[in-house]
Curated annotation (Swiss-Prot):
Gene3D superfamilies (UniProt xref): 3.40.50.2300, paz domain, Ribonuclease H-like superfamily/Ribonuclease H
Annotated family: Belongs to the argonaute family. Piwi subfamily.
Disruption phenotype: Progressive loss of germ cells due to apoptosis during larval development.
Keyword Cytoplasm: yes
Location within or outside the cell: Cytoplasm
Annotated site (Required for binding 2'-O-methylated 3'-end of piRNAs): M378
PROSITE patterns hit by this protein: PAZ, PIWI
Underlying gene: piwil1
Expression (tissue specificity): Expressed exclusively in the adult gonads; expression in the ovary weaker than in the testis (at protein level). During neurogenesis and organogenesis, expression is detected in CNS (midbrain and eye) and fin buds. Starting from 24 hours post-fertilization, expression is found in the genital ridge.
Gene Ontology CC terms: cytoplasm; nucleus; P granule
Descriptive protein name: Piwi-like protein 1
Description of its domains: The PAZ domain specifically recognizes binds the 2'-O-methylated 3'-end of piRNAs. The MID region is required for recognition of uridine in the first position of piRNAs (g1U preference, also named 1U-bias).
InterPro entries (UniProt xref): GAGE, PAZ_dom, PAZ_dom_sf, Piwi, RNaseH-like_sf, RNaseH_sf
Piwi domain residues: 552-844
């Protein structure tokens, strides 16, 4: 898990049930609890966001209805689901040209299956909401429930009740039903149950309810919730040689799609490490010694996600309580109890190291009834297991290979896992009873649908056009020996190397000269500069040798240590703006691979200096394509970096790039408004005219942020365009690009379940009726399942046909110059990602504006 997905998962597990000791007012650390107290009864997401259709309920009514699920256990509700906010965003109805149809026509038809199952309900199914009154009033919620459900014969077995609002799958005989109950001490209580709302199956509250119900089903199947997803601890994959365990599981969501309410279910894996946090701390202390241990421990542990197996909950480590040990006490009810005794009495666990310090996890969610959070959770390292992988583990080829053997599923394996889930749902009696009482069921097969495979593109290079194998989506062989569109001659460039790498530096230089000729690149011999293998020496060598007229700097690094790489990029991107290429010596140390590596390096160097490699046919004239992405920089005070890349020419081979650091709380588009104006001025300078059509691909939009893009970012983009002249009104399209999705598609090719071919478009069945959206499978993968990309056109006054929008989007996936093949997203999105990542990871400052016209970040 990376990026935004990781950010979403950090923090206490979304589905944690109350664990003793119970909820109390906020406490100081002296009285902090060893495990989280009762989580908040958070509000239903998606409330009031959907614009009411004619006859639909008001926002006020939605708020009232939503309150009815407040007391369903938060574990069942699955935590705060931001994707429900997005389901209330209606954009298609504002675009006249796609109101009737948003489907394309190009390409050849292909039969597909998708990881979706239809939710079926009995005819005329509805969810009925009732308000419940007690006379005399009853304070205890538990007592109110007990008194009400003395009348199960009248109400039925299926019900959800929060103490005031009742939901039933069946309509009671009368709009107002009066019931009489009796407390244990003989007090008579009159209960009035009044019908207040009848909710259709596709209402937002019903959709929320289906998801709650499905989480209940997963628990009946003995699956454990960790974070937002459910995993099976009874069927783990153990990798003992690396001390790792994998729990298989599923990520699920139920939403309204084009013509059906469907469950989307995809395979998920939770990687657990066999070592506890205490084991890790012991090992770290041995490595760094007592004096450096506190600092090193804080650096290594804070921010990590851990799992406590005694309750299968995940927590984010926010701090370390160096003055707390298991012998400290906290208040449980009216008595003081030590952490040590608490774990013994509550879980039967013995703490072996009484001197271990405690971990702190802040509970940010509000307490019941909107009260402040219940205070930090204090965790015992001995019972906390590390999750996920360290950077060192990710860099270990053997670990990643062994992990992939369990987690990188083929299309056949992935479909098989999902089919097994369907089978388990249909075979389990308890699950069927739960569904039947609510009048619901799931279709017992995956959804079948039709897609289209777009025609493959012809690659234009050196005055020629050629085709490539559409199944591999790669043209590295086809472009060999062909001159590039435009080449920058290398007359003044430097190569830095250490004494140990002198031989590989010479080999690289000779091979670069050999491969550059056929491409059309004129390359003079580089000035060779030796530096000592120290960061200060490297920086000094750069400062002394890189001049204003230097065209390119190549640095051969002895290892992939980040500090040396960062040093090079900071100096050459900020202080002394010069295109640069870093190469790790190991990459060029194998003679048999040197020609291939040198070819890729030569291509990158040419791009970074302003050269153009290849193109595809773009029929639209006076078109500017813009890509926007962002990155969260933890080193720069948790500021976000916004990157914008805009095309300057017809062939989409020249780009203007700008990166800005946002202030905390500032919207990305506020920071990038000036960048868009700069791009338009650069386009005007390059073409002697402004673009008549602008298409913005906005990547990096997380769940729940769609409304902000529509309400705030689109008007800001339009305002920014207006600064070029009040009479300047280009046609504008804004497309939200989403990679982190759980939708998967399977084709049957030569009788086998396989990935859909590159260029597969899906724009029916699994798209959303309120959006102008589509999926494209653009790239090919050699192993595992290919992941589609979701495109949601949130604003479009261009009148461009859906077919043209889809084909243009696919064409742009061919234009990323760091890969001789098709990539998963349009090139400007990938460029923006690379730029934001470079600034967030290495530079931490805005790059020098002299580099704006170059792809220096490739």
């Amino acid at each position: 898990m990376t990026g935004r997905a990781r950010a979403r998962s950090r923090g206490r597990g979304r589905g944690q049930e109350p664990a003793a000791p119970g909820a109390q007012p906020p406490v100081s650390q002296e009285a902090a609890k060893p495990v989280v107290s009762t989580p908040s009864e958070g509000q239903l997401v998606g409330r009031g966001r959907q614009k009411p259709a004619p006859g639909a309920m008001s926002e006020e009514a939605m708020l009232q209805i939503s309150a009815g699920f407040q007391q369903v256990k938060i574990g069942e509700r699955g935590g705060r689901r931001r994707d429900f906010h997005d389901s209330g965003v209606h954009t298609r109805q504002l675009m006249e040209h796609v109101k009737e149809s948003k489907t394309g026509v190009s390409g050849t038809a292909i039969e597909l299956r998708a990881n979706f199952m239809r939710l079926l309900s009995r005819p005329m199914w509805a969810l009925y909401q009732y308000h419940v009154d007690y006379k005399p009033p009853m304070e205890s919620r538990r007592l109110r429930s007990a008194l009400l459900f003395q009348h199960e014969e009248t109400l039925g077995k299926a019900h959800t009740f929060d103490g005031a609002i009742l939901f039933l799958p069946n309509k009671l005989r009368n709009a107002e039903t009066v019931l009489c109950s009796e407390t244990r001490n003989g007090e008579k209580v009159e209960i009035t149950v009044t019908l207040t709302n009848e909710l259709p199956p596709s209402s937002p509250v019903c959709l929320q309810f289906y998801n709650i119900l499905f989480r209940r089903i997963l628990r009946i199947l003995n699956m454990q919730q960790i974070g937002r997803h459910y995993y099976n601890p009874d069927d783990p994959f153990n990798i003992p040689q690396h001390r790792l365990t994998i729990w298989p599981g599923f990520m699920t969501t139920i939403l309204q799609y084009e013509s059906s309410i469907m469950l989307c279910s995809d395979v998920s894996h939770k990687v657990l490490r066999s070592e506890t946090v205490l084991d890790f701390m012991y090992s770290l202390r041995q490595q760094c010694g007592d004096q450096r241990f506190p600092e090193a421990c804080t650096k290594e542990l804070v921010g990590l996600i851990i799992l406590t197996k005694y309750n299968n909950k995940t927590y984010r480590i926010d701090d370390i309580a160096w003055d707390h040990t298991p012998n400290n006490t906290f208040k449980k009810g009216d008595t003081e109890i030590s952490f040590k005794n608490y774990f013994k009495s509550q879980y039967g666990l013995d703490i072996t190291d009484g001197n271990q310090v405690l971990l702190v996890s802040h509970v940010k969610r509000l307490g019941p009834s909107g009260r402040p959070p219940p205070g930090p959770a204090m965790l015992v390292p001995e019972f906390c297991y590390l999750t996920g992988l360290t950077d060192k583990m990710r860099a270990d080829f053997n670990i990643m290979k062994d992990l992939a053997s369990h987690t990188r599923l083929s299309p056949e394996q992935r479909e098989g896992r999902i089919n097994r889930l369907i089978s388990n749902i249909n075979r389990n009696g308890d699950v069927q009873n739960e569904l039947t009482t609510w009048g619901l069921s799931f279709e017992n097969k995956l959804l079948s649908l039709n897609g289209r495979v777009l025609p493959s593109e012809r690659i234009i290079q050196g005055g020629r056009a050629f085709e490539y194998n559409p199944w591999t989506a790669d043209w590295s062989k086809e472009m060999r020996g062909l001159p590039l569109i435009s080449c920058m001659s290398l007359d003044n460039w430097l190569m830095f190397y250490t004494r140990r790498n002198a031989d590989v530096a010479q080999s690289l230089l000779q091979t670069l000269n050999k491969v550059s000729g056929p491409m059309g690149i004129r390359m003079q011999r580089a000035v060779m500069i030796e530096y000592e293998d120290r960061q200060e020496s490297l920086l000094r060598a750069l400062q002394q040798n890189v001049a204003r007229e230097t065209q390119m700097v190549v640095v051969i690094l002895p290892t992939n240590r980040k500090d040396k790489y960062d040093c090079v990029k900071k100096y050459l991107c900020v202080d002394c703006p010069t295109p640069s290429q870093c190469v790790v010596s190991r990459t060029i140390s194998k003679p048999q691979a040197l020609m291939t590596v040198a070819t890729k390096i030569a291509l990158q160097m040419n791009c970074k200096m302003g050269g153009e490699l290849w193109s595809v046919e773009i029929p639209l004239r006076q078109l500017m394509i813009v890509g926007i992405d962002c990155y969260h920089d933890t080193a720069a005070g948790k500021r976000s970096i916004g990157a914008m890349v805009a095309s300057l020419n017809q062939g989409m081979s020249r780009w203007f790039s700008k990166c800005v650091l946002q202030n905390r709380g500032q919207e990305i588009i506020d920071a990038l408004k000036g960048s868009l104006q700069g791009a338009l001025k650069a386009y005007l300078k390059y073409n002697n005219s402004l673009p008549s059509r602008i298409i913005v691909y906005r990547d990096g939009v997380g769940d729940g942020m769609l409304q902000s893009v529509v309400d705030y970012e689109v008007p800001q983009i339009m305002q920014s365009i207006k600064t070029m002249g009040q009479d300047y009104e280009p046609k504008l399209s804004v497309v939200v690009v989403k990679k982190r999705i759980s939708s998967r598609f399977f084709a049957r090719i030569d009788g086998k379940i396989a990935n859909p071919p590159p260029g597969t478009v899906i724009d029916t069945e699994v798209t959303r009726p309120e959006w102008y959206d589509f999926f494209i499978v653009s790239q090919a993968v050699r192993f595992g399942c290919v992941a589609p990309t979701h495109y949601n056109v949130v604003f479009d006054n261009s009148g461009l046909k859906p077919d043209h929008m889809q084909r243009l989007t696919y064409k742009l996936c061919h234009m990323y110059y760091n890969w001789q093949g098709i990539v998963r997203v349009p090139a400007p999105c990938q460029y923006a990602h690379k730029l934001a990542f470079l600034v967030g990871q290495s530079i931490h400052k805005e790059p020098n504006m002299n580099l704006d016209d170059f792809l220096y970040y490739l």
